[in-house]
C-alpha cells in the first residue's frame, strides 16, 4: 500500500480492515466514516468511550469562533499570571524538556501574524463542521445536536467586549462567516435571565449549536458497533506497540496481537507516545480543562460564555455545566480542586440563580494542544499509519469533519484540500 506523506502512487490500494486507537469523538467519527466507505473497523481504548477530553467538555459546536489557541492575548498574561493557580491559563513550574519545547513553540506562535495564518488554514475544515454532524444524524446516530437559539458572550463593560469584536473582524478577514448582534446588558438579560446585573455588555452569536458530549459520543460508539464495528476497552486494550510490517500493521495490546491493513492513532493528549516513531515530531501537550455541573433556577436556552474569565456555561438537562481553565500539565495528573474553585469564583458574579456551591460531576480532561494551534491529521511516515489529533479545544466541534476527511484520504489515497495544512509530519 505505497502511500507516503510526500505523495501517493497510482497503485494505491484501499485498506479493508483498519484499527482505530482511541474511542473519543475523533476516533469514533473516523471509524463511522470509514464504515460508510466499506471499511471494517476495530476500535481499541484502554480507558473507555469518551474517557479522555470528550465526556466533560462544554459541548460547544462553534465553528464560527473555532480559532487557533496560540494568540497574542496569551502573551499578555505574562509569566507571573500563568504561574498563578487561579489564572485561567495555568502553567505549573516544570523542567520537562518536552514541556519546555512546547512552551517555547507555543509562545513563538502567539503572535498576530501566526494567528492570522493559522486561522486561514482552519477556515475550510470549520465550514464542514456542522453539516458533518447532520450526516451523522441522517446516518442513524440517535443523540442529536441542539441549535443554540441564544449563544451569549457576556462582559462587564463594552470596553471588555472590544476584544471579541476585534477577533470577529479578524475571523471575517480570514474568510469565515459568523453572524452576531451587539447587545447592552439589559438586552442580554431580556434574552437570558440567568445573567446578573454585573453584565453590562454582550454579543449574541448566531448559527452555532451545542450537544451533551457525555451522551453524544457513546451514541456514536453504539452506532459504530451496530454497523458491525468492534470496540474493545479496558486494561487489556491498552496498545503497547504498533509496527508497520511492510504488508500491514501489527497492533500489540495487553490482550494480544492483531494484524490490520492500516491504523489510525486518535489518542488525544497521548498521541505522541505512539505517533513519534512514525515521524510525528510535533509536541502534543495536555491542556487540561475542568468542568462541573450546578443547579439553576432556570436552565438557559443556550450556552453562555464569559470570555474575560474564560468560562463556558452549557445547559445540559436540568443543570448547567460550567467549564474553563487551560492547565498545561501531565494528562495523568489528578484533578486539582483549586482549579474548580477558581472557575466557580470567576463565574459567580455573572450568573443569577446558579448555585455554584452545589457542584456535581467535577471533571478534568486533557485537551491535545499543539504549538501552532493546528491539528495533526493525515498519513505519517508509514504509509499504513495515520494520525488524528491535536485539536486543542476544538475536538468536539471538528471531530466529525476530521473523521470524514481522513476516511476519504485513507480510502482514496489523496489528501483532501482541507487537510493539507495539517500534515502530522510537518
Spans of features found by a protein language model:
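N-terminal Rossmann-like FAD-binding beta1-loop-alpha1 element of flavoenzymes
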Residues: 16-42
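C-terminal catalytic lobe of FAD-dependent flavoproteins
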Residues: 308, 351-426
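Extreme N-terminal leader/targeting segments of oxidoreductases
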Residues: 1-18, 36-37
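Glycine-rich FAD pyrophosphate-binding loop
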Residues: 36-55
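A conserved short coil-to-beta-strand element within the FAD-binding core of flavoproteins
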Residues: 183-187, 191, 232-249
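Rossmann-like flavin
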Residues: 100-219
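Active-site substrate-recognition segment that forms the wall
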Residues: 57-60, 65, 69-109, 239-241, ...
